[in-house]
Curated annotation (Swiss-Prot):
Guanylate kinase-like domain: residues covered: 282-451
Organism phylogeny: Eukaryota, Metazoa, Chordata, Craniata, Vertebrata
Name of the protein described by the UniProt record: 55 kDa erythrocyte membrane protein
Taxonomy, superkingdom: Eukaryota
Annotated GO CC locations: cell-cell junction; plasma membrane; stereocilium
Natural source organism: Bos taurus
Job description of the protein: Essential regulator of neutrophil polarity. Regulates neutrophil polarization by regulating AKT1 phosphorylation through a mechanism that is independent of PIK3CG activity.
Gene designation: MPP1
SUPFAM superfamilies in alphabetical order: P-loop containing nucleoside triphosphate hydrolases, PDZ domain-like, SH3-domain
Entry similarity comment: Belongs to the MAGUK family.
Length: 466
């Protein structure tokens, strides 16, 4: 049976309800006092200079403006990295390239991106190699003294953005990242709080719910999409090195991802912006899996065991009704002309043909189930996930994988291969993945997880709210 996904309808039905829920959540959160983050103490003293020989003089010399120089002192009491990367600017001056959120320097709050470093513990950074300075910084214990020229540009407020990862990432295997040790490992489905995205290629973030407080580097959406589309093996642009004093690198590849239509054609995925909502009921349960994995059995069991909770939208078909079939029960029987008109009007969520007859599921039949305060069960093809994943249908998507136990027959191996193909392409849509070793256990886990999701705060696509 060849199925096609309909263009569908707008998400206006649920959008208002979820928008109101989100607004109420924000108001409640805003009225609560924010926790105070602990900071390390740092001593700062401002001086003025128009050159190295005039440190401490507040005056200006003829034709020159005095530059504000800040003396920063703080104590390094552990082996913890300082959490900064530096680079040489166009004047070959050493400047702060990035500050890792939650790291030592971020917590004591005295350095900022763009600050120019003049001295470290009384040693002028000019005329010293990067290796020498890096070694000195690493071996320094106790009090650290820095003379810096603060960056005068306006500092942006902290971000409040969360993204759901749509791919697995391990910085240890990434040849593009400027510092593997500073990278953040995550898996598909992890929610990442974005801390900083000043660098167009490397954002800073941390996995929500993780015990790790400090942020790590992650590829920006543009970089990840460029990487996937081009099969990149080299970095697309300059990036600060991992050492505290990074050397400039030049790369051959020119990064033009933002202006390329190739990503629309390839459907490249990276991250999805999400928001956290208070508990609300998911209105649709979607079962995804390869043909023969047991979705129909699971669907039938859910319907028979919970008739007051779940319902299945009867498909429409142009096939003639059999004697034992009642119109509107197993199927809605309509003419080919009616089916064609409804398809043209985008009334079908999914439609296709089988043995010369047309079949399809209408949005309206799903809505009717929702109006009865029941959960609609859909067992659709993976390509339809984009259509159903809206605030209007508010789906909970479950991927059913074949058993990994027992004898590996040719049929089972093919089923596992088909299943893996679906998983690799659509895993970023799944709310739950289950291996169907036992129908009873699968049903139990599915229902428990679904019920728990409806009772708990949930991360949903930002498009469901705005």
């Amino acid at each position: 049976m060849t199925l096609k996904a309909s263009e569908g309808e707008g998400g206006g039905g649920m959008r208002t309800a979820l928008s109101d829920l989100y607004l109420e959540h924000l108001l409640q959160k805003h009225n609560r006092p924010e926790p105070v983050s602990p900071q390390l103490s740092a001593v700062m003293e401002d001086m003025y200079t128009n050159g190295p020989a005039a440190l401490g003089s507040p005056a200006q010399t003829q034709g020159q403006e005095a530059r504000k120089v800040r003396l920063i002192q703080f104590e390094k009491v552990t082996e913890e990295p300082m959490g900064i990367t530096l680079k040489l600017n166009e004047k070959q001056s050493c400047t702060v390239a990035r500050i890792l959120h939650g790291g030592m320097v971020h917590r004591q709050g005295s350095l900022h991106v763009g600050d120019e470093i003049l001295e470290i513990n009384g040693t002028n950074v000019t005329n010293h190699s990067v290796d020498q300075l890096q070694k000195a910084m690493k071996e320094t214990k106790g009090m650290i003294s820095l003379k810096v020229i603060p960056n005068q540009q306006n500092r942006l407020p902290a971000l409040q953005m969360f993204m759901r990862a749509q791919f697995d990432y391990d910085p240890r295997k990434d040849n593009l990242i400027p510092c593997k040790e500073a990278g953040l490992k995550f898996l598909t489905g992890d929610v990442i709080q974005i801390i900083n995205k000043d660098d167009s290629n490397w954002w800073q973030g941390r996995v929500e719910g993780s015990s790790q407080e400090s942020a790590g580097l992650i590829p920006s959406p543009e970089l990840q999409e460029w990487r996937v589309a081009s099969g990149a093996h080299s970095a697309p642009s300059e990036a600060p090195s991992c050492s505290p004093f990074g050397k400039k690198k030049k790369y051959k590849d020119k990064y033009l991802a933002k202006h390329s239509a190739i990503f629309d054609q390839l459907d490249v995925v990276s991250y999805e912006e999400v928001v956290r909502l208070p508990a609300f009921k998911r209105k649709t349960l979607v079962l995804i899996g390869a043909s023969g994995v047991g979705r129909s059995h699971i669907k039938s069991a859910l319907l028979s065991q919970n008739p007051d909770k779940f319902a299945y939208p009867a498909p429409y078909t142009t096939r003639p009704a059999r004697k034992s079939e009642e119109d509107g029960k197993e199927y809605h029987f309509i003419s080919t002309e009616e089916m064609t008109r409804s398809i043209s009007a985008n009334e079908f969520l999914e439609f296709g043909s089988y043995q010369g007859n047309m079949f399809g599921t209408k949005f309206e039949t799903v809505h009717q189930i929702h109006k009865q305060d029941k959960v609609a069960i859909l067992d659709i093809e993976p390509q339809t996930l984009k259509i159903v994943r809206t605030a209007e249908l508010s789906p909970f998507i479950v991927f059913i994988a074949p058993t990994d136990q027992g004898t590996q027959t040719d049929t089972l191996q093919q089923l596992q291969k088909d299943s893996e193909a679906i998983r690799s392409q659509y895993a970023h849509y799944f709310d739950l993945s289950l291996v169907n070793n036992s129908v009873e256990e699968t049903l139990k886990t599915l229902q428990e997880t679904f019920d728990q999701a409806c009772r708990s705060p949930q991360w949903v696509p930002v498009s469901w709210v705005y």
